[in-house]
């Protein structure tokens, strides 16, 4: 994205955004409520368009958007379908049919420890289980790009910690590009290869690249990010 701008009713939510996501990279977009991070993700997903600037996709046919899976804050599972049927739901869409394989989709349930839930309905799942299923459903269409909009924010801290480890394993094993929107500094530090901070009016307020096994547990790096993030967020974390 180069010079990305977006406004709603005259209020800027993205202001001159220049950001690149490399193939296979895990990027965390960090920011307070109202910083424009969800709008940025919706633009990447094709659910919103920029008012100005450009969005370019490398190494895709004709520069088209890569095959993309999206998971929002709520799992949005179909309540009348079982977990297995929800996982297979993606094949109903023409854009996904060519890449969708039933055996692969159900294999993901086994591979990531959810096969015991296959016959359950969404109202029989915990919040953490529902979000895992939503992520597997998105992964089942074999996306090159997985977009996650604060998928763990409504869960309690213990469950969030467990799911972060699970997500890191999934992203690494499937080798997909991930953009995660979050307001949680520790979540960003644990998962991301790179952190992009959005500040007021959707401006980039900082960017940090994390080397495996080094920057993630560095208290000075965490303090630096919190300083940029702002005093209010520091209190929350």
List PLM regions with ranges.
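Conserved ABC ATPase signature
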Residues: 121-125, 129
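ABC-type ATPase nucleotide-binding domains, specifically the catalytic core motifs of the NBD
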Residues: 9, 49, 81, 85-101, ...
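A short, proline-enriched helix->beta-strand linker immediately N-terminal to the Walker B motif
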Residues: 140-144
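Conserved ABC ATPase "signature" region
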Residues: 99-117, 169
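Helix-to-loop junction immediately C-terminal to a conserved catalytic motif
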Residues: 45
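Conserved beta-strand-loop-alpha-helix hinge in the C-terminal portion
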Residues: 201-227
């Amino acid at each position: 994205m180069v010079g990305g701008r977006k406004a709603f009713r005259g209020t800027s939510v993205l202001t001159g955004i220049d950001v690149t996501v490399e193939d296979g990279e895990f990027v965390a977009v960090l920011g307070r409520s109202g910083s424009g991070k969800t709008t940025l993700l919706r633009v990447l997903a094709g659910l919103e368009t920029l008012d100005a600037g450009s969005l370019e996709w490398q190494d895709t046919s004709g520069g088209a958007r890569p095959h993309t899976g999206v998971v929002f804050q709520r799992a949005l599972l179909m309540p009348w379908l079982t977990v297995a049927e929800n996982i297979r739901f993606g094949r109903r869409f023409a854009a996904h049919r060519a890449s969708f394989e039933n055996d692969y989709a159900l294999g993901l349930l086994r591979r990531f420890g959810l096969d015991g839930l296959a016959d359950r309905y969404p109202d029989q799942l915990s919040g953490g289980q529902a979000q895992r299923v939503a992520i597997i459903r998105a992964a089942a269409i074999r996306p090159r790009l997985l977009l996650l909009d604060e998928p763990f924010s409504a869960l309690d801290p213990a469950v969030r910690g467990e799911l972060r480890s699970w997500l890191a394993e999934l992203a690494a094993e499937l080798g997909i590009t991930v953009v995660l929107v979050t307001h949680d500094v520790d979540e960003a530090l644990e998962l991301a290869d790179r952190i992009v901070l959005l500040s007021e009016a959707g401006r980039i307020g900082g960017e940090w690249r994390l080397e495996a096994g080094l920057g993630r547990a560095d208290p000075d790096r965490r303090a630096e990010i919190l300083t940029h993030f702002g005093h209010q967020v520091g209190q929350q974390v």
